[in-house]
């Protein structure tokens, strides 16, 4: 009799919590019990809504935690160096990454999520409500059309994206939203040397950080771009 292939069991919340705790410790990110709980609740929301809204190609909650949550947490020590209070815009946020993770891990920050797809904004608003994130806001529309003081409250200390667009395009589209002293941060896989070579005038790489994400065997880089007009 041929044995039927069994589907891998879905990881329990306890298993995910252990993975999250170990990963956050390895990244040097201090999380309270409430913050860990909120991140696990966020994974559950992603898994639930993903079936209908196709927010991510990753279906397994364990891989969601590694490839989305820990990946996003890996930038917290670098962005958090700005201080306990800052404003951030997550461009092309999709399912809320990395913005929702930043809002949970950096509760003193005011984080705005931006996407052009209404159903993704709907999920982001649902997550904001269910996770009780008072420091999170959502705006739908193309980033290049957003007006400080009208569509968004003002300019931002940090503008970040995760696999949103070519680095040069990202900078061109979002630079009008950078506050004085602020910068643009791009989460990338392999080192994007060709994209860096296409940066527009008045933009330059301030730092490029090689990231190591626990349990993830993949190359990751975080690029900070500074602008002449924001110095």
From Swiss-Prot:
Entry superkingdom: Bacteria
Q: Where does S-adenosyl-L-methionine bind?
A: 92, 97, 143-144, 162
Q: Which gene encodes it?
A: rsmG
Catalyzed reaction equations: guanosine(527) in 16S rRNA + S-adenosyl-L-methionine = N(7)-methylguanosine(527) in 16S rRNA + S-adenosyl-L-homocysteine
Q: What keywords would UniProt list here?
A: Cytoplasm, Methyltransferase, rRNA processing, S-adenosyl-L-methionine, Transferase
| Record has Transmembrane as a keyword | no
Which Pfam families does this chain map to? GidB
Q: Name one GO molecular function term.
A: rRNA (guanine-N7-)-methyltransferase activity
Q: Which InterPro entries match?
A: rRNA_ssu_MeTfrase_G, SAM-dependent_MTases_sf
GO cellular-component term (any): cytosol
Question: What is the official name of this protein in its record?
Answer: Ribosomal RNA small subunit methyltransferase G
Localization, per the record, is: Cytoplasm
User: Which enzyme class, named as a word?
Assistant: transferase
Query: Could you tell me what this protein does?
Result: Specifically methylates the N7 position of guanine in position 527 of 16S rRNA.
Per the record, the similarity remark reads: Belongs to the methyltransferase superfamily. RNA methyltransferase RsmG family.
* Cysteine-cysteine disulfides: none
Enzyme Commission number, as recorded? 2.1.1.170
């Amino acid at each position: 009799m041929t044995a039927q292939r069994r589907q891998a069991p879905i990881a329990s919340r306890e298993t995910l919590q252990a993975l999250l705790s170990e990963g956050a410790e390895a990244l040097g990110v201090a999380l309270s019990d409430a913050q860990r709980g909120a991140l696990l609740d966020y994974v559950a929301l992603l898994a639930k809504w993903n079936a209908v809204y196709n927010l991510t190609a990753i279906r397994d909650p364990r891989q969601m935690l590694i490839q989305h949550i820990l990946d996003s947490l890996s930038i917290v020590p670098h962005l958090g160096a700005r201080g306990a209070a800052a404003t951030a815009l997550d461009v092309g946020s999709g399912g809320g990454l990395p913005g929702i993770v930043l809002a949970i891990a950096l509760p003193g920050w005011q984080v705005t999520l931006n996407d052009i797809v209404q159903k993704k904004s709907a999920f982001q608003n649902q997550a904001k409500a269910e996770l009780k994130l008072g420091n999170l806001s959502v705006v739908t529309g193309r980033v290049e059309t957003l007006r400080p003081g009208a569509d968004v409250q003002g300019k931002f200390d940090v503008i970040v994206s995760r696999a949103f667009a070519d680095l040069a395009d990202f900078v061109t589209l979002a630079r009008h939203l950078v506050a004085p002293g602020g910068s643009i941060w791009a989460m990338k896989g392999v080192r994007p040397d060709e994209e860096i070579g296409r940066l527009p005038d008045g933009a330059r790489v301030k730092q490029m950080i090689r990231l190591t994400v626990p349990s993830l065997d993949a190359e990751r880089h975080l690029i900070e771009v500074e602008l002449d007009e924001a110095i």
